[in-house]
């Protein structure tokens, strides 16, 4: 079957680590605390990414591994237990404590699973302690959420009741809107993972139909299947088309009449089309290069090409689960280069050679590329922004049209990298 050209490369990477996901997870579950076991670098990353004031009481922190810990001269397990006890004594509102591994803790083989088990025995149910890895040694930053949710799956109560389970963190307002729309479709029992309170874990079992809201939850999906749930394969809810197909997959699973689906969703699609028009005028015909970082690249590429008229130079993704992404791959134009993995130097060479109008990349690459005259969009901004659902299609398109509008105001009529070449019409 014709489709995109799937390629693979390996080499040096330029990505954030999984600790970054704590920034949105701690906001999602205000009764949870994320204790990173890592270095001062880990602490600086989380503090900077979250933008928390120094006098605030954040719901995350770092148990810093000292040189004595790293050299094996001190018992890091005893010190970790002491820090956890002091934290829980000072913050009695904590109901779930996540022990989050990092590159340093993995290098010295610190067993956080054992630490969580010891603390659970000691606390006797007063606080639930779970662990997962946020290390960036072999993963990218969004996989931190996959690790956190995968750690919760064994704790979910069992139930055979018929329900729809939305898996993946969404902005509260976006989630409320989607649940409202599912209710209008006749799907009334809708739950979420992660929940808004860490103790209100949704049940799972043979009657559970799972709809992933994010494309980077591979391990969580596998564990939910092992619990008896059915995980639907559908395009992800980015853009109007993807969001509609995503909701239609749930409607089909719950045997909702297609005519009723059309009655509910057609007016929303028309509103989205109108909202997209001013951004499509800017984006249509422009060439975009997506570097791998967030694993949102394939759904974004599909949206930008099919709904905004952009030309895909190359679509990079850190990892490609072909089964989970089958619906997205099927919607990409034939011959589109989809590159799994990264050799950052080679990819930057291809960026310079292809001279795209816009590059989606990590913060570490954005400023150097901007200095070379190449317009960029931070991929991490797409993770923090409320972009899911039909209603958000216009806002999603604006995130890409804004840097091009800004560049045209600064250099009207000029190509981003070749001043003697006109901007694509």
UniProtKB/Swiss-Prot annotation:
Entry's EC annotation: 1.3.7.7
Protein's name according to its UniProt entry: Light-independent protochlorophyllide reductase subunit N
- The signal peptide stretch is none
Can you tell me which residues bind [4Fe-4S] cluster? 17, 42, 103
The protein's superkingdom reads Bacteria
Enzyme's top EC category: oxidoreductase
Biochemical pathway = Porphyrin-containing compound metabolism; chlorophyll biosynthesis (light-independent)
**Keywords, comma-separated and alphabetical:** 4Fe-4S, ATP-binding, Chlorophyll biosynthesis, Iron, Iron-sulfur, Metal-binding, Nucleotide-binding, Oxidoreductase, Photosynthesis
Q: How is the cofactor bound?
A: Binds 1 [4Fe-4S] cluster per heterodimer. The cluster is bound at the heterodimer interface by residues from both subunits.
**GO annotation (BP), single:** photosynthesis, dark reaction
What family does this belong to? Belongs to the BchN/ChlN family.
Tell me the subunit arrangement.
Answer: Protochlorophyllide reductase is composed of three subunits; ChlL, ChlN and ChlB. Forms a heterotetramer of two ChlB and two ChlN subunits.
Q: Which cofactor does it need?
A: [4Fe-4S] cluster
């Amino acid at each position: 079957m014709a489709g995109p050209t799937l390629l693979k490369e390996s080499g040096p990477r330029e990505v954030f680590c999984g600790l970054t996901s704590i920034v949105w997870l701690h906001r999602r579950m205000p009764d949870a605390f994320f204790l990173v076991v890592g270095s001062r670098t880990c602490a600086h990353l989380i503090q900077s990414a979250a933008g928390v004031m120094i006098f605030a009481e954040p719901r995350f922190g770092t148990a810093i591994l000292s040189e004595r810990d790293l050299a094996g001269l001190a018992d890091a397990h005893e010190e970790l237990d002491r820090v956890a006890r002091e934290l829980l004594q000072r913050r009695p509102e904590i109901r779930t404590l996540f022990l989050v591994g990092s590159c340093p803790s993995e290098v010295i083989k610190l067993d956080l699973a054992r630490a969580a088990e010891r603390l659970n025995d000691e606390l006797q149910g007063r606080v639930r302690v779970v662990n997962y890895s946020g290390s960036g040694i072999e993963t990218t930053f969004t996989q931190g959420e996959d690790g956190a949710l995968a750690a919760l799956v064994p704790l979910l109560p069992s139930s055979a009741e018929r329900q729809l389970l939305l898996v993946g963190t969404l902005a509260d307002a976006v989630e409320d809107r989607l649940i409202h729309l599912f209710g209008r479709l006749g799907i009334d029992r809708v739950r979420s993972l992660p929940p808004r309170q860490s103790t209100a874990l949704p049940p799972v079992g043979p009657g559970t139909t799972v709809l992933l809201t994010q494309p980077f939850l591979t391990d969580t999906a596998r564990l939910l299947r092992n619990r008896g749930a059915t995980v639907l394969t559908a395009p992800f809810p980015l853009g109007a088309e993807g969001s509609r197909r995503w909701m239609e997959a749930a409607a089909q699973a719950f045997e909702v009449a297609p005519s009723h689906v059309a009655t509910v969703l057609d007016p929303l699609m028309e509103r989205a089309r109108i909202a997209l028009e001013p951004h499509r005028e800017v984006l249509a015909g422009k060439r975009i290069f997506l570097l791998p970082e967030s694993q949102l690249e394939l759904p974004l590429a599909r949206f930008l090409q099919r709904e905004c008229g952009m030309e895909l130079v190359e679509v990079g993704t850190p990892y490609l689960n072909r089964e989970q992404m089958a619906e997205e791959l099927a919607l990409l134009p034939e011959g589109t280069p989809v590159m799994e993995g990264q050799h950052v130097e080679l990819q930057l060479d291809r960026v310079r050679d292809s001279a795209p109008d816009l590059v989606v990349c990590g913060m570490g690459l954005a400023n150097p590329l901007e200095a070379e005259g190449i317009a960029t969009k931070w991929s991490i901004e797409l993770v923090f922004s409320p972009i899911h659902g039909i209603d958000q299609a216009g806002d999603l398109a604006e995130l890409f049209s804004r840097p091009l509008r800004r560049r045209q105001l600064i250099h009207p009529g000029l190509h981003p990298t070749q001043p003697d070449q006109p901007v694509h019409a």
